[in-house]
Amino acid sequence: TYIEQFATLAVEEMYRSGVPASITLAQGLLESGYGLSELAVKGNNHFGIKCHNNWKGGRMYYDDDRKGECFRKYPSPEQSYRDHSDFLRYRDRYKFLFDYKVTDYKSWAHGLKKAGYATDPAYPKKLINLIETYELYEYDRKPASFAKSDRKAKRNHEKPARKVKEEKVKVEKTADPVAEPEPELPKSPNEIEQVEALTNEQRQDFQFS
């Protein structure tokens, strides 16, 4: 799901920038249509951030409040998440948001609307509804180690598949008939005598047993 895919990023950004993970995830869900919007799919733009005057990266043109508006385009979703945090962190109109506790998602939701992030009057209500429906507030209380352990778990989850594949190859190799090795022949007269003596003893054991 979208939440499972991007929760780690949201928590990482929370500890880097101070933006609540719940707010980041809720905005991502809402703005990107659960990751299925044209901006998200073609431009990795999960937050509907427009170009503005100082943007020097990739661009996409999309009909929003006005026709053919310029939106930022990113090489990856990770860069979209990072830019979203910095967009809020370094713009004066959003500075007051960082006076709220990271767990106060309701104040953050209303503050985003007040600062002009969205024109929809129901924007705060939509964010809060998403946060409470999916219990996104739980991510606001995750320790910093959550992101690292989650990434490690995902890497470990991928390893068994490769291991099973390797074992399968080994089984297929050993399944082929293997020829028995030919008996090693003695290379010297002494070895010949030893073999003959051993053969005679074995014969005697067989005869008198």
Segments the model singles out, each with a brief description of its role:
Residues T1-L198, Q202:
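Catalytic cores of secreted/periplasmic lytic hydrolases that degrade extracellular macromolecules
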Residues S209:
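LysM (lysin motif) carbohydrate-binding repeats in extracellular/periplasmic proteins that recognize
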